[in-house]
Amino acid sequence: MNKLSAPRAQHAVDPVELTADLVRCQTVTPEEGSALKLLSALLSEHGFQCQRIDRNGIPNLFAIWGEDRNGRTFGFNGHTDVVPIGDPKDWTVDPFGAEIRDGILYGRGSTDMKSGVAAFAAAAIEFVNETPPDGRVIIAITGAEETGSPDGTRAIVQWMEANDIRADHFIVGEPTSLKSIGDAIKIGRRGTITVFLTVTGVQGHSGYPEKANNPLPALVDLLQGFGQAAMDEGTEFFAPSTLAITTIDTGNPARNVIPATCKATLSIRFNDKWTSGKVLDWVSRHTRAAEDKFGVTISADHYLSGECFFTPPGALSKLVQDAVEQETGQRPQMTTLGGSSDARHLFKHCPVVEVGLTGETLHQVDEHVSVAEINALKTVYGRILRDYFGSEGKI
């Protein structure tokens, strides 16, 4: 393997300009807004083979450089879709104007996560053209991460596997830093499952409760039990799993009618002690006990946003930590904080770590990112690529 050195500047792509170009694309999820077309044209110009992997109307882009299947394959995952802007009158700038003021770039998606996509694309273009590695570099971008669509990153991974394309390692460019770029990376995230409870009793007149079976006491008792039951005490890298009661509803406008049904919603975030199946079994034990106690029927439908993912500390996380420390001067802590990300679709394919900017203004009015941070992230990604392909089999 050739010794890899720092890239020269002749193939430089300005990550700030690319971020601005992407922000100007109005990509409120799941609209493509020409962002993937822009990326595809740029990457193709610099030697990447690009293919759209759209599924059920969801836009996705797969780009790969290199044809050496005997070498290692390194992947980057990100998204170009953004959340809605809310009321434009609340913004002090054009949400899609990409205005730069006093070293700050403003716009929806500037933090989450068009700057991350731009930084890696710029770093990868320089790397593969100036120090071509023995291996392949993949850039997998979806236009529907914010909706949690199963036709986004998951569709790309399924297409890769169906076409015998396997990455050895992936990084995801979500904002992971806490206060300053490089202070944290994510090696895992909690799983998320929403449970929709429906308790069914017997409707009746509130003046004759003996002729009815009110489902509300059963629901109240059940929810109290959930509130008092700790799922676990946490693990080495994860905080305790949590259950939040987010809705309670009878749909009953009459004050003198005992309702036939009542409903509640549970939002459960679970750590690496659990799978979604184990969580549902735990919920079922509680609902069966309430059925027996109150003589009601309880159904529990669910929506799984994603399983918990965890990449144990090892060669990949150390390489990323070392690269970040070399470029920023601080060694990032390994965390599992936050909600779910598209890493949940990648962790069964290969080891995955998340590394990106700070996220203090993501999804907020006047979302913005420091120009200096975008440039710094590009250098971090460039260092990761050089160290990865120059590690002589250490990872």
From Swiss-Prot:
Listed EC numbers: 3.5.1.18
A GO molecular-function annotation: acetylornithine deacetylase activity
GO BP terms, alphabetized: diaminopimelate biosynthetic process; L-arginine biosynthetic process; lysine biosynthetic process via diaminopimelate
The species this protein was found in: Ruegeria sp. (strain TM1040)
Q: Note the SUPFAM superfamilies from the entry.
A: Bacterial exopeptidase dimerisation domain (SSF55031), Zn-dependent exopeptidases (SSF53187)
Alphabetically sorted, this entry's keywords are:
Amino-acid biosynthesis, Cobalt, Diaminopimelate biosynthesis, Hydrolase, Lysine biosynthesis, Metal-binding, Plasmid, Zinc
Which top-rank group of organisms is this from? Bacteria
Family classification: Belongs to the peptidase M20A family. DapE subfamily.
Query: Where on this chain does Zn(2+) 2 bind?
Result: D112, E146, H363
Q: Does the keyword Metal-binding apply?
A: yes
| Subunit description | Homodimer.
Is Glycoprotein one of the keywords UniProt gives this record?
no
Pathway linked to the protein: Amino-acid biosynthesis; L-lysine biosynthesis via DAP pathway; LL-2,6-diaminopimelate from (S)-tetrahydrodipicolinate (succinylase route): step 3/3
- Cofactor: bound how, per the entry note? Binds 2 Zn(2+) or Co(2+) ions per subunit.
Query: Which co-factor is required?
Result: Zn(2+); Co(2+)
Q: What is this protein called?
A: Succinyl-diaminopimelate desuccinylase 2
